[in-house]
Amino acid sequence: MSRLTAEAISLSFEQRGQRRAILRDLSLGLAKGESLVVLGPSGCGKSTLLNILAGFQKPDQGRVQIDGRTLEGPGGERGVVFQDDALMPWLNALDNVALGLRIRGLGKAERTARARQVLQLVGLQEYAEQSVAQLSGGQRQRLGLARALAVEPDFLLLDEPFGALDALTRERMQVLLLDLWKQTGKGLFLITHSVDEALFLATDLVVMDGPPARIVKRLPVDFARRYAAGETVRSIKADPEFGRLRQALLDEFLDVAEAEHAH
């Protein structure tokens, strides 16, 4: 089974004449079929870690590998979805999805067929000819997911993809993401500062603090697998164990914040 790993990653940059550490000797990994969610406050290094996994930034030390092969930059085995959808506003939905396939050398008929296939997967088949400006925020994020899925990556890397959405749309997108995860068997790497989102979407949850980024806690979570097995969202979120873990994680963040304030 394909596995994506970050091994002893460190990164720092110059600030006012001094080196500032963002990541220090950080290691983690996930396999296809798993959903690794990194939960942490803004500014702790989550997005930097995702950018390194995606190949957009190079670490000062350490390496990113898939199945033992060191990665030197972006690649088709990793699809990326951002909070800012980064769509091409002058293209319609279908052409936004097909663009990445064109760059990879697919012929017009093949890329159009593939683009329509993934638009159907995310429920946007009726909006294929619509311009980006005509789409709602939730539809734009669906389109971002479709574009990432079109190149058939083994792993989806998602940088707070639902953070700008209203609460109801956000929950619908979480459910869609788990539906796609169940259907495709891809590995998910998602970063968020929402405790509820992390608990619902993760099979493995990493709590991060920083900078420099450090892993405070790792724990296995079974709510995503329970949803994939047919349990309802309402039943999962009404489970006392969901509430207990939610409160424990919130308490952990409060403890860290109070300790920092004391210093």
Swiss-Prot record:
Reaction equation(s) it catalyzes: taurine(out) + ATP + H2O = taurine(in) + ADP + phosphate + H(+)
Record Gene3D superfamilies: P-loop containing nucleotide triphosphate hydrolases (3.40.50.300)
Membrane-related topology note: Peripheral membrane protein
Annotated localization: Cell inner membrane
Species name: Pseudomonas aeruginosa (strain ATCC 15692 / DSM 22644 / CIP 104116 / JCM 14847 / LMG 12228 / 1C / PRS 101 / PAO1)
Chain residues that bind ATP: 40-47
Function field: Part of the ABC transporter complex TauABC involved in taurine import. Responsible for energy coupling to the transport system.
Family: Belongs to the ABC transporter superfamily. Taurine importer (TC 3.A.1.17.1) family.
Underlying gene: tauB
EC number: 7.6.2.7
Subunit description: The complex is composed of two ATP-binding proteins (TauB), two transmembrane proteins (TauC) and a solute-binding protein (TauA).
This protein's UniProt keywords: ATP-binding, Cell inner membrane, Cell membrane, Membrane, Nucleotide-binding, Translocase, Transport
InterPro entries xref list: AAA+_ATPase, ABC_transporter-like_ATP-bd, ABC_transporter-like_CS, ABC_transporter_ATP-bind, P-loop_NTPase
ABC transporter domain span: 4-235
One Pfam family this sequence matches: ABC_tran
CDD domains attached to this UniProt entry: ABC_NrtD_SsuB_transporters
Protein name: Taurine import ATP-binding protein TauB
Principal subcellular localisation of the protein: membrane
Top-level enzyme category: translocase
Gene Ontology cellular component list: plasma membrane
GO molecular function terms listed in the Swiss-Prot or TrEMBL record: ABC-type taurine transporter transporter activity; ATP binding; ATP hydrolysis activity
